[in-house]
Amino acid sequence: MDYTLTRIDPNGENDRYPLQTQETVSGDPLEQHVHRSVYMGKLENAMHDMVNWGRKNSLWPYNFGLSCCYVEMVTSFTAVHDVARFGAEVLRASPRQADFMVVAGTCFTKMAPVIQRLYEQMLEPKWVISMGACANSGGMYDIYSVVQGVDKFLPVDVYIPGCPPRPEAYMQALLLLQESIGKERRPLSWVVGDQGVYRANMQPERERKHAERIAVTNLRTPDEI
């Protein structure tokens, strides 16, 4: 599995995204520790698994929305969908108490600096979900006043397609984010281990389901969809 490595440099000059240089590395980053010491490698792996388990099962979203996609996001908090099953029901009014931000809706150029400032105020570790076609690529607003994708100024972890996406799509994005967090390798301390953040490169759902869709021979009628 390939990982994206982001080096941590607290003395870096840049104060905007991307804060650090990124590179793609192959293989599990813990393999080097396993070959050096089997006991310490297993112990460090268990520590990472335990910390990641706590992080992925207590994701607190930042109460922030831009447009109509935000309505679909908050719909998942109702009793019908019950997003509390995934531990992501605690909305935070302050970015300093939130774990991830959902950019739901159209991002205008005047709003981009505000979003970036809110992202910078979030504490590490933090993640970003881009929800809807407008947040992903500008949507139907191919115009000077709309940012053509929030990944122009924010590091996006999960993209949710749709205009607008259904609440089920948002909950699936939470599951994908939890899966990604479970494979992350972050420094356990500022003095222990490699000072770099390893994120597993996620396979797009389109590619993952491609073979399954090609194998379908009996298509459902429009009434059955």
Curated annotation (Swiss-Prot):
Binding of [4Fe-4S] cluster, residues: C68, C69, C134, C163
Localization: Cell inner membrane
UniProt GO cellular component terms: plasma membrane; respiratory chain complex I
Disulfide-linked positions: none
Leading EC class: translocase
NCBIfam families registered for this protein in UniProt: nuoB_fam, PRK06411.1
Protein name: NADH-quinone oxidoreductase subunit B
Organism: Yersinia pestis
